[in-house]
Amino acid sequence: MPWDTEAFLSSLISVSDATASVYKRDLNAFINWSAETDVHEPEDVSRRHIRHYLAWLQEKNYARRTIARKTSALRRYFRWAQQIGVTSTDPCIEIQAALGEGRLPRVLKQQEIKVLLDSPRASVLDQDGPRRLRDDAVLELLYGSGLRVSELCALTLKSFDFEKNLVRVLGKGNKERLVPLSQKSVKALNAWISEGRPEFLTLERSHESLFVNLRGKPLTPRDLRRLIDRRALSPTNPHAFRHTYATHLLDGGADLREVQELLGHADLGSTQIYTHVSKERLKRVHKDTHPRA
């Protein structure tokens, strides 16, 4: 088969099965569209052909986020195709898809961060000690290292190197990465591990999971959402911590590819949305503060 999509999909060792399935569907849609325009082999795909396809998707009223996802699949395919010699060039170079669906990832405001991390609401001040230590450690880790919810819930005691202040994270597609720990995260984690966690465990329910619920079982994504609901001033999605982490890194001058590595993104396009978030925030600051804005 000229497109050799099965070989491409087999090469995707750093993505989940669900992502690979989406790539397969998006590639097949592109191949079928290309055939209708008399383009039957990947070598015949030009940059103009890609642009025409994206324009066609827009005319068909596909959501901007869907177009961005389809573009990501094409980028990865043609990068692979050029590397193994299926094509002589990469027609997706300099091709950019529309970002998002009009709504950018939510970034927590400084006051929200302060309430969540430094001065919890009065209603949670009377929590029992162990749960408070756990919640503090969870929130510091979410904001300080930008972990996904699934990644945080999967952490074990062996995930950490406190001598180097690093955490080993198992991300999408079982891809491992090392992420630095903030000083406040280290302090909160040490308090939880030494003082809080033992209170939740007994000999009958001893295991390696770092975070556990009141029954001594591993913390679940649902448990984590409830934890955040108790601390937040307004409804807050756990993923907002990851968005805030990435945006604050870029605001502080971090390189885009460094942020990509810290987040565990397989494709740089997934990280680029945060540059857009940063630009939008700068525009709002300018509009709100400059007398001639």
Short names for language-model regions:
Residues M1-A293:
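Conserved catalytic core of the tyrosine transesterase superfamily
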